[in-house]
Amino acid sequence: MFGKLRPIVGRLWAAPARGLLALGVHPNAVTIVGTLGVVFGACFFFPQGGTMLFWGVMFITVFVVTDMLDGTMARLSGKSSRLGAYLDSTLDRVADAAIFGALVWTFRVEEPATAMAALLCLAIGSFVPYARARAEGLGIDAKGGIAERSDRLFLGLLATGLVGLGLPLWILTGTLYILAVLAAITVGQRTMAVVRANREDFATPAESTSGDA
């Protein structure tokens, strides 16, 4: 859902992206700094609980937006590269691990149901990009799905921030379980894209022989 907004957001980021490029900042540097900011914000703020959950979300959000800024910078500068794509994808996984891992740590003792929900989001969510990468390695387009990373990240941070403002914890717990289910569905959708692209693998020997004839 939110992935479809990338072209619009990219245009909004054009001005600051040009400014950073004028200062000689490399897109890969923005990617790395953004990830470090997310990791610090999640690991420092979330374990303190309470209102620090909200402030952690605010801090993290500032750095999450760099995920779009670095891409805009790369396109404007013509510095798009395989290294940049690799860093962007790999460091996204690091950021996700920090966010959901910090939530697991925060609630592991007093709220095990919430901790388990965060753990499921982390575990199942890691399969989503793998399913796409493996499909693309086979030459198959398996983008999209009911809940891409940006969707899960937005909803997870939103629920965390609301709990930090004093709303009931079940809002976060329920949201995380729903996100885990949506991530599983997304993996299934991408798997089906591969299945549809390789229907011949499911043909019986008799069907294959008659087809060749």
PLM segments and residue spans:
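Hydrophobic, well-structured mid-protein blocks that either form specific transmembrane helices
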Residues: 59-111
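Hydrophobic alpha-helical transmembrane segments
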Residues: 1-61, 98-213
